[in-house]
Amino acid sequence: MKIDLNSDMGEGFGPYRLCDDEAMMKIVSSANIACGFHGGDPDTMARMVRLAKANGVGIGAHPGLPDRAGFGRREIPFQPDELRQQMLYQLGALMAIAGAEGMKVGHFSFHAAMGNMVNRDPVLADLMMNAIATVDPRLVVFVTPESEIERAAKRAGLKTLALFLADRAYDAEGRLVARGLPGALVKDETSVRARVRRFLTHGQVEAIDGTIIAMPAHSILVHSDTPGSLELARIIRSEIEASGATLAPAAEHAA
């Protein structure tokens, strides 16, 4: 079995660093690179691409809303076509920078509020996925299982890779618990290890209310801004290796 381990990276800008990207890049198999709106800038994007190339890590675009102060986690009521252009602008920027460094963008992962907005609107999801397919039909789209984005990506002929968020709680319906609610963030090392082990062994996760739910995913995400994210990523990687699974970038094992 192949498993991808990924993290959102390059989300600082200028002299500001959100996490130790250099250390994280030595642990993950895929990097979701911020594209300049919620985080990142041209120099940071180029640095992330070079780090990924040096470490044999696959790269993906991680576009968000133009809201640095809110880190792209606040919804802004843009028109659908405006959102489409914002997404394409960011994707195109990373593709150009990657190409100049001899790398290809292999996957795509929405950031926070932009993804939430797309995921609850099937018309918007189709608009976005069709645009991505026109730019590069080989891109792999990170999705939540049974989501609008997953369905739209498949309608557009794009490959998908389902995500398990190791540091976020799920409800009994398989939805992420809103960040503002108690228990939404899972940062305890023992809890993360147990969650990942259950996922790798049984394809399941324990929801916040204790319900055991199916988690049909092949990629594990740890957020770089989660407290202790580096150690959590090391724990997750060790569990993947101990399970006998092969660590592989997203583009190598999408459905």
From Swiss-Prot:
GO terms for molecular function: 5-oxoprolinase (ATP-hydrolyzing) activity; ATP binding. It is an enzyme of class 3 (hydrolase). It catalyses: 5-oxo-L-proline + ATP + 2 H2O = L-glutamate + ADP + phosphate + H(+). It comes from the Bacteria. The keyword Chloroplast does not apply. GO terms for biological process: carbohydrate metabolic process. Catalyzes the cleavage of 5-oxoproline to form L-glutamate coupled to the hydrolysis of ATP to ADP and inorganic phosphate. Forms a complex composed of PxpA, PxpB and PxpC. This is 5-oxoprolinase subunit A 2. It comes from Agrobacterium fabrum (strain C58 / ATCC 33970).
